[in-house]
Every structure is written in C-alpha cells, then in structure tokens.
C-alpha cells in the first residue's frame, strides 16, 4: 500500500486530523507507527461507537500498530456503571467482543488494561508531571472529554485527575497517533501542548464524527455559547437515552422500529441521523446501497457512493421512508454477526441485562 493509499484510508470519514502534514511526514518516515484509542467501558455498545471501530480497522489495515486501552479506572473515576469496577470490567470484555465480531482483527491489536498501568509508579509520576505542566483552568475546560461540564468538577476531586491521566496514557504508551471522537479534542490538544513542555513526542490526533441521536440534531438552548465540539457531544447518540440510540444487541425488529421512528426530514441532510448512519457506518462496509421502491415511484435505484445518495435525497428524489427501509436492512446485516456472537455466550447475555440496569451518564 502506497503512502497516499494509507493516508486516504486513515483519513476517510475523519472529522478532523491534527495535523495532516504531520501525519504524512510520519508515514513518509517509514517507521512503524503506534496509535491508540481508549474506551470507557460504560454501558451497552451503540452504533455510534462503530464509527471509531471502523477507524481502528482502517488504521490496522494501513499498517499502524494499534493499542486498545480498556479505560476501566477512567470509567470508575467518571462514575460509570455506578462505580462498580467488576461490572466495568465485564463491560470491557463485552466491548472487545463486539469489536472482534464487527470485523477488526483483534490479534493485531495490543489490548491494554488501565488496571495494569495504574500499578506502575512511572505512570503516576507521569500524571503528576502532566498536571504540573497544565493550568487548573485548562484541566477544568477539558472535563467535557468525560461528558461533563467544567462546573461538575465540584462533585469530587478525582474528576480533575482524569484529563491528566488521559494525557499520561498517551505518553506512557509512546504513541504517534491518538484516535477519538471529536469530544476528545480537548484532551488531545492538551497532550500536544504538554508534549512540547515535557519533551515528549507530539501526537497526531484523528477525530471521528459523533453520530447524532435518533431524535436529530436540533439545537437546544443548553448549547448556546458552547464550542462546536461540545455542541456535538450534547446532541450525540447516547447510551443513557435508549430511545435515541441503536444498540448492537438490539433485535432486528427493534432496529427497524427505531430507524423508522427516527428524525429524517425530507430533503434535509444536516444533523440527519439516517444519512449519518449511511455515511459513517454503512458505506464504509459496502460498495453500494440499494433503495427499493415501487415501480410507480421510479423503481429500485442503487448508489455507489454516499455523496451521490445525499444529493439525490436533498433534491427530493428519495423519500424518507424508502431511505429508512434501506438503512435498516443494511444496518441489520452489519449487526447480525455481532448479535449471534453475543447470543452464543450466556455470560454476555447476562452482562447485557446487568449493564442495562446500571447505565449512568
């Protein structure tokens, strides 16, 4: 695979690359690059997470040595799953199982547990050094990476450790690339700034889009005055709002019901969850999407790329109901092997039930 091909694969469907020039230089160096994503095991896996899962797959195929960090301690600090570490660890196992059955070759991943990292004194020395090189105001602004606002630091002081831990994860693993949703931008920018002060390697940040919730992306009064990445974090698909999300364990019928009830105004592409599912989840997996229609309405039509489909939708050539049916059909094809894998393992079925009762924001 050429450098241009690797670059195209790594950057496709990314919301932001900081910076593209640095990424190209790293690829041109011909050194084996190391990347990572850390995930909080915080509940059921919804399809929004498939966006970064696909990007992990892309990076592995592009020859990047990827680390998957099971951020169990981070989830505990963030009060996920009631702060029950045993349940958090179960959720981590479940997440890795989903990633594997999505099609990521987990044998090529370096899977690291935060539990192991926090046992190392060198790790905590890094956390302190990062904190010493960061202002309190900067740390508080970065709390949105946890899905929290700056004022929520008053809940308990451990919340203030979280951003320094995330930056320390990056330095401890000696990474070239950090992958995350756009909601992780503040942590990655903090890491880049602190790297210069501490003489550490400056990461390239790859930010994937956040899938909007099924209710759509109508701007709420709560988002007034917020930065764009924080606004997207507010309207994203969330496991704490089950009817706004599609979970990988949902039945075929539930997927169809949720898709058919989703926000999808005729001719409108902005913050349209159905179009986003097609763009970020379905088209990266399939060469085409077929819209089945009655012959009276023009008959079946196939689209070989997302841009062509979006244009047709904006121009009113595709009806929302036809779009939804095609989306549900393709999405269920992607989810079927994941569902079957979870069904074959009773421990995961039991885990899903426990997690469903314990999900927190």
Curated annotation (Swiss-Prot):
Segments carrying motif 'KMSKS' region: 236-240
Keywords: Aminoacyl-tRNA synthetase, ATP-binding, Cytoplasm, Ligase, Nucleotide-binding, Protein biosynthesis
Catalysed reactions, as listed in the record: tRNA(Tyr) + L-tyrosine + ATP = L-tyrosyl-tRNA(Tyr) + AMP + diphosphate + H(+)
InterPro entries: aa-tRNA-synth_Ic (IPR002305), Rossmann-like_a/b/a_fold (IPR014729), Tyr-tRNA-ligase (IPR002307), Tyr-tRNA-ligase_4 (IPR023678), Tyr-tRNA-ligase_arc/euk-type (IPR023617), Tyr-tRNA_synthase (IPR050489)
Main location: cytoplasm
Signal peptide: none
Pfam families per UniProt: tRNA-synt_1b
Quaternary structure note: Homodimer.
Name under which the protein is recorded: Tyrosine--tRNA ligase
Species of the source: Saccharolobus islandicus (strain M.14.25 / Kamchatka #1)
Gene name, Swiss-Prot/TrEMBL: tyrS
